[in-house]
Amino acid sequence: MQDNFTASSPSSSSSASGVAEDNLAARRRRLKFRANHRGTFETDILIGGFVEANADTMTAEELTDMENILEMPDPELTDWLFGRLPLPEEKATPMLRRMVEDSRIRRGG
């Protein structure tokens, strides 16, 4: 009977690392596309600008947080990013706080 199990070698570890990096790169590309194609000019500029400036340094956890933010409705995001409404505490993830602050700076506020 042949053994179907093989020991992990350094090359398999680096290969797994390469796959993980490829996965992060693909997520970053999708995130950039989604952030720049929201449907309204204002959100494309604010959200797209933030993502373009920050996505390449985001961790996997930060990418997940940003992906979840992009699931939120544009009217809510726009109100928070333009400072028309305060950011509700239950929605205030570290990433969304960064976005609100970035938006405030970009708007010169």
Curated annotation (Swiss-Prot):
Listed Gene3D superfamilies: Flavinator of succinate dehydrogenase
Chain positions covered by the region annotation Disordered: 1-22
Subcellular location per the Swiss-Prot or TrEMBL entry: Cytoplasm
Taxonomy, superkingdom: Bacteria
Gene: sdhE
One GO CC annotation: cytoplasm
Compositional bias per record (Low complexity), positions renumbered to this chain: 7-17
The keyword Cytoplasm belongs to this UniProt entry's keyword annotation: yes
PANTHER family the UniProt entry points to: PROTEIN EMI5 HOMOLOG, MITOCHONDRIAL (PTHR12469), SUCCINATE DEHYDROGENASE ASSEMBLY FACTOR 2, MITOCHONDRIAL (PTHR12469:SF2)
Keywords assigned: Chaperone, Cytoplasm
GO biological process, one term: tricarboxylic acid cycle
Function, as annotated: An FAD assembly protein, which accelerates covalent attachment of the cofactor into other proteins. Plays an essential role in the assembly of succinate dehydrogenase (SDH, respiratory complex II), an enzyme complex that is a component of both the tricarboxylic acid cycle and the electron transport chain, and which couples the oxidation of succinate to fumarate with the reduction of ubiquinone (coenzyme Q) to ubiquinol. Required for flavinylation of SdhA, when the SDH operon and this gene are overexpressed in G.oxydans. Flavinylation of SdhA is detected only in the presence of sdhE.
Family, similarity comment: Belongs to the SdhE FAD assembly factor family.
A Pfam family assignment: Sdh5
Full protein name: FAD assembly factor SdhE
InterPro entries (alphabetical): SDH, SDH_sf
